[in-house]
Amino acid sequence: IYGCEAYLVDDLQDLVVNSRNQSLEDAYVVFDLETTGFSTVANKIIEIGAVKVVNGKITDKFSTFVNPEVPIPYRIEQLTIINHNMVLDAPTIEEILPKFLAFSEGCVMVARNASFDMGLIEANCKGQGIEKEFTIVDTVALARVLMPQLNRFKLDTVAKAVGVSLENHHRAVDDAACTAEIFVKFVKMLADRD
């Protein structure tokens, strides 16, 4: 229909994937990836940012560029402000992934659009012969449940709605820290519902 804007929402999307009876009272890692594009099959990771949260507080950070070993498309440079020179001397995903997995060992993994970011992590694990199972929480799915009045669930929109500051948008560790603050508020909102 001309002039109509529509959104397809999977109402059956899981909030938690592969639950192993872990608790959010345990440590969890909120992470974000910047990539060369929007495909978990064809694109590469160029930055990993993560924060570890214990008792509702950020206790540790993990942040690194990743050399994708392919050129970064111009549109991605414009979006992330990450260019080829910034990643040229960075370690490759083969070097970084084991360090990221060690950082997040035993933690629930939390991400925005978790199927995309975890898809890339899982694909890289598979490519390196690493067998790993993750408990995954998607903050976008959670936002849809807790804040159905929002028309959009982009990071900046949700951050503004819950009163969280977002600085250096599209830089992985800053987006992860913002997502962590949002998630802490979501956990409180869920507790208040009980």
Q: Where do the protein language model's features map onto the residues?
A:
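A generic structural signal for short hydrophobic patches within well-formed alpha-helices
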Residues: 121, 142-143
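Conserved non-catalytic scaffold segment of RNase H-like nuclease domains
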Residues: 24-134, 148-170
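Acidic two-metal-ion nuclease catalytic site recognized across multiple nuclease folds
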Residues: 182-194
